[in-house]
């Protein structure tokens, strides 16, 4: 509720049981290609002065601890691989249930490969892993 109030949105009435995060663009506040273009578009021009500002940092403890179990997917050829692995470290630090599916270096496995190339064997493996993870969480 605190995060929703800071973002000036309503709390989602359907409780989230799990998240599948594929090649996440978690760090929108970095001084890089994503951080230079997205923050003002996503959060507005004065977001740094808002109550929502801390939540822009995906390693912010209150944000991380508010998340349901997460399945993270990346590959060594994903240009945002470092974002996913850093976020995974935050989930570990705060003892949040999660799983990391990190594929080895392969030129076909670029950013969001399982979405853009759904017929690759690794894409099938990703979708299967997400389905199994969600089913496991749902059974608990």
Protein language model annotation of sequence segments:
Residues 1-140:
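Alpha/beta-hydrolase superfamily serine-hydrolase fold, recognizing
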């Amino acid at each position: 509720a605190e995060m929703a109030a800071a973002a000036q949105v309503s709390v989602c009435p359907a409780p989230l049981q799990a998240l599948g995060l594929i090649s996440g663009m978690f760090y929108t506040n970095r001084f890089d290609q994503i951080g230079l273009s997205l923050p003002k578009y996503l959060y507005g021009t004065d977001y740094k002065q808002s109550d929502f500002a801390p939540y822009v940092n995906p390693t912010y403890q209150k944000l991380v601890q508010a998340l349901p179990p997460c399945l993270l997917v990346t590959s060594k050829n994903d240009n945002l691989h470092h974002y996913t692995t850093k976020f995974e470290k935050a989930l570990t630090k705060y003892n949040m249930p999660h799983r990391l599916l990190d594929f080895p270096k392969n030129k076909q496995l670029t950013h969001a490969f399982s979405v853009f190339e759904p017929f690759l064997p690794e894409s099938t493996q990703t979708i299967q892993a997400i389905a199994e993870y969600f089913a496991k969480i749902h059974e608990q």
